[in-house]
């Protein structure tokens, strides 16, 4: 019969297309899908493709007013996960037109906005994204990148050294600045505000900025090296964040810092643009990442959050330490460290890289090894991360 038929249809009739040849402009996603008992994997994979693109739970007459073939996400391949019962990797291709240019926020809202609460799925994890050059070229990316940072700092052929000022909460601004001076004078390249140092009653941000700047200039004068302190510009509103970055620029310091997940991608991208326009380096902390990436079978893998940060913009990002953890984790960590630093990364499933990623000429991000590391870890850290990294102690 011709005409419109309402009713609930299986997603796989429309959204599971194993014969589909992916386009060079498609955004590709690899999801780890755990279907509910009785739900076939093809239906679960198609449901993800539908709900994160053009589909809804039923057919509506307005579907006829657009071209689904042009705009729908497609689940084009499904494979079982070795060694896991009832787990599959579903590959989904999204047409480029579904996404706003230069917006990580919109990309995530589309791809992971709704599907994770889906009834047909017991659990869902976004393992990897392939960002085509046609899309990544709409982003500024890191404010400066690895090479420009080395030129600004005049430090080459070695990892950069930093430490976080402790106790992280409770010091007055003056004593905080004193600790910054001692660390920088003693030979570190950078000191760091802790991620939860914003502007608390015992130390308001402007006081901290002034005393830290004094410490930087004093240490620079005495050592003849360029020094920096990651001044945390993260704030309760985007306007306040930019205000703090403006103050840092006026004080003439080299680098500011942002918590990109708690602060949000929109704020982070604004800050990255400001930093490039004004010659500030941008250090990114990943506070809250484990809420999103820790579960093996649900959430978003950190390599996706790392790719998103490279697009949104940051010159440093915390990326784990590898030291003392499992060997397998080492390969996976090195996988996303390469995704942060290199121009072109080959698909390599043993390192968790599901797609070949071509960043073309987008600047790289320095990985920051941070969290529970001390001097005895140095040989392992330099072997794992090589020269292009920041070793952040404390």
Swiss-Prot record:
Its EC number is 4.1.1.39. This is Ribulose bisphosphate carboxylase large chain. The modification N6-carboxylysine is found at residue 192. Pfam families: RuBisCO_large, RuBisCO_large_N. It is an enzyme of class 4 (lyase). InterPro entries: RuBisCO, RuBisCo_large_chain_AS, RuBisCO_lsu_C, RuBisCO_lsu_C_sf, RuBisCO_lsu_fd_N, RuBisCO_lsu_N_sf. The gene is rbcL. The keyword Plastid applies. SUPFAM superfamilies: RuBisCo, C-terminal domain (SSF51649), RuBisCO, large subunit, small (N-terminal) domain (SSF54966). Heterohexadecamer of 8 large chains and 8 small chains. The active site is at 166 (proton acceptor), 285 (proton acceptor). Keywords: Calvin cycle, Carbon dioxide fixation, Chloroplast, Lyase, Magnesium, Metal-binding, Methylation, Monooxygenase, Oxidoreductase, Photorespiration, Photosynthesis, Plastid. The record marks 325 as: Transition state stabilizer. PANTHER family: RIBULOSE BISPHOSPHATE CARBOXYLASE (PTHR42704), RIBULOSE BISPHOSPHATE CARBOXYLASE LARGE CHAIN (PTHR42704:SF19). PROSITE patterns: RUBISCO_LARGE. Binds 1 Mg(2+) ion per subunit.
């Amino acid at each position: 019969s011709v005409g419109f038929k309402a009713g609930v249809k299986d997603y796989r009739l429309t959204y599971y297309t194993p014969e589909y040849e992916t386009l060079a402009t498609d955004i590709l996603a690899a999801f780890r899908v755990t279907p509910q008992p009785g739900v076939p994997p093809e239906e679960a994979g198609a449901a993800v493709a539908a709900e994160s693109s053009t589909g809804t739970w039923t057919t509506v007459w307005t579907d006829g007013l657009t071209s689904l073939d042009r705009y729908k996400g497609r689940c084009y391949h499904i494979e079982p996960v070795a060694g896991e019962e009832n787990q599959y990797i579903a590959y989904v291709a999204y047409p480029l037109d579904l996404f706003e240019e230069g917006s990580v926020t919109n990309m995530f809202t589309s791809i992971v906005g709704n599907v994770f609460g889906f009834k047909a799925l017991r659990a869902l994890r976004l393992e990897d994204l392939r960002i085509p050059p046609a899309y990544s070229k709409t982003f500024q990316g890191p404010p400066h990148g690895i090479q420009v940072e080395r030129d600004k700092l005049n430090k080459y052929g070695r990892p950069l050294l930093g430490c976080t000022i402790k106790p992280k909460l409770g010091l007055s601004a003056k004593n905080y600045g004193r600790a910054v001076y001692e660390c920088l004078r003693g030979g570190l390249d950078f000191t760091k505000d802790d991620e939860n140092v914003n502007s608390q009653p015992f130390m308001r941000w402007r006081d901290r900025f002034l005393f830290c700047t004094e410490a930087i200039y004093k240490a620079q004068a005495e050592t003849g090296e360029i020094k920096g302190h990651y001044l945390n510009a993260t704030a309760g509103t985007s306007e306040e964040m930019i205000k703090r970055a403006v103050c840092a620029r006026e004080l003439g310091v080299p680098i500011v810092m942002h918590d990109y997940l708690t602060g949000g991608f929109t704020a982070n991208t604004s800050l990255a643009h400001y930093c490039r326009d004004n010659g500030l380096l941008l250090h990114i902390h990943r506070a809250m990442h484990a809420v999103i990436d820790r579960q093996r079978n649900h959430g978003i893998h950190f390599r996706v959050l790392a790719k998103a940060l490279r697009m949104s913009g940051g010159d440093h990002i915390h990326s784990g330490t590898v030291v003392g953890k499992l060997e397998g984790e080492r390969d996976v960590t090195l996988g996303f460290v390469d995704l942060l630093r290199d121009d072109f990364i080959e698909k390599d499933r043993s390192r968790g890289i599901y797609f070949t990623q071509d960043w073309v000429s987008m600047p790289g991000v320095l990985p920051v090894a941070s969290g529970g590391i001390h001097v005895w870890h140095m040989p392992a850290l330099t072997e794992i991360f090589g020269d292009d990294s920041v070793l952040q102690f404390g």
